Design a protein with these regions (language model features):
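Function-determining sites in protein domains
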Residues: 3-13, 19-174
């Protein structure tokens, strides 16, 4: 084998090795997130066409009908949006969305560690991509997120929780 062919073979081998490493690295960074939000949900979070921030309160008026388009079911309870804001282009939400699709930012069994925390589901991020909508319900007091797809909660780390709280304060004043 001539020297030129050897270097071409070496470059292609290195490229294949690095491609395999990149795929393995990406898998380890996102596989639990994809199971939690679902493939379409993870895609919606990572690159949404539209992003809305909702401030939520529990729906307590059982005698009246739920308003259409302003409610979210979270853990067998209905929540209603008291404020809505389009934050698609708002500063900070691209980074927040990026944080929500990385495994390292989650605690996958928060109830075992913080069993005394009662979540107050006060905010939700609605990610829309095409016809698909992913709802990320957030309890800032417990540092938890809720997935309707998985019908379970997961903890988010303290820095992500604090960052989301700052963003919500800036956008909604709450």
């Amino acid at each position: 084998m001539t020297r030129g062919k050897f270097f071409i073979f070496l470059i292609f081998s290195l490229a294949l090795l690095l491609t395999g490493f990149a795929l393995l690295y990406r898998y380890t960074q996102t596989h639990e997130v994809i199971a939690f939000w679902g493939p379409e949900g993870s895609q919606s979070i990572s690159s949404p066409d539209h992003l809305e921030l909702w401030q939520l309160v529990p729906w307590t008026d059982q005698s009246a009908d739920l308003p259409q388009g302003s409610t979210i079911p979270i853990q067998d309870r209905q929540y209603i949006a008291t404020k809505k804001k389009d934050v698609t282009k708002a500063p900070g939400f691209i980074n927040a969305s990026g944080a929500l699709i990385l495994n390292r930012n989650y605690n996958w069994s928060p109830r075992a560690e913080e069993s005394d925390c009662t979540p107050a589901w006060t905010h939700a991020l609605l990610y829309r991509r095409g016809a698909h909508t992913t709802v990320v319900a957030i309890s800032l007091n417990c540092g938890w997120v809720y997935s309707r797809k998985a019908n379970r909660v997961a903890g988010i780390n303290k820095s992500v929780t604090e960052g989301l709280a700052r963003l919500f304060q800036e956008q909604l004043g709450s």
